[in-house]
Amino acid sequence: MSDDVQERLKGLVETHDVLLFMKGSPLFPQCGFSSRAVAILNHLRVDFESFDVLQDQGVRQGIKAFSDWPTIPQLYVKGEFVGGSDIMMEMYESGELAQMLADKGVVAAH
């Protein structure tokens, strides 16, 4: 991954409180995993930004090295990598995701 891509990714994850790197957009996800990630965030009423990795091959490959995680989608909260779709689902089902988002001041505690 080039330094330019690394700096761009760092800037993106630090600029947005909640950022989802995904395939497609929240309105038109291009894979089931991205769709599930969006559904989880929407259900928790999280205000989030998304980045469509299908529109930028450098970011699509770079984000995998940046996070040391091989798949998309990838969720970042307050600059910290949380995980992909499966981890999001596990955390959502256990209540851990809602608690983490509340602890970081992103959503109100339920």
Language-model regions: role of each:
Residues M1-K10:
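Flexible, polar/low-complexity N-terminal or interdomain linker segments that lie immediately upstream
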Residues R45-R60:
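Thiol-based oxidoreductase modules, predominantly thioredoxin-like and allied folds used
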Residues K10-D47:
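Local sequence-structure signature of Cys/Sec-based thiol-disulfide redox active-site neighborhoods
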